[in-house]
Amino acid sequence: MAFNVAEFRANMIGDGARPNLFQVSLTFPTVATNGTAAAQKTIFMAKSAQLPGSTVGTVPVFYFGRELKFAGNRTFTDWTLQIINDEDFVVRNALESWMNAINSHAGNVRNTGAVNPTGYTVDAVVTQYGKAGNELKSYNFVGVFPLDIAPIDLDWGSNDVIEEYSATFAFQYWESNTTT
């Protein structure tokens, strides 16, 4: 096959999808302090995210010394957001209170509002947009809850920067507007 720039360009629909045209919508459960305000702010403060992946495992079966592989179960890797921190700490405080409701710092107990998964899990959506502002694809993460809030490094020599931190979430599975 000969190298053909015109064919390549003709197959690059919309000049390619751009990773900076996205939005995250993360709701917070009622056990999270200021969850409504944090949800509204996350739309603007979620600096980076991922479109999800998944893995189908294999089930090896041996037959006369030969390994045969059969399709196994699907698994999903954790989902991480990079979040910009502003001076009201609304998103971080809501994430901390959400995690504390799941398992408190001192008491090692769960908040009564978070006894069942419906009390501490929510859905989250990542939407990828085209350059004209049209929605290209969206993913709904089902049963999201926080696993990790990364520390924020402080440094007297850090000038001209805004604090950022990552938050990692577990989820049950994802659904897409284009995947059945």
Mark where each language-model region is.
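Glycine-rich, low-complexity intrinsically disordered segments
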Residues: M1-T180
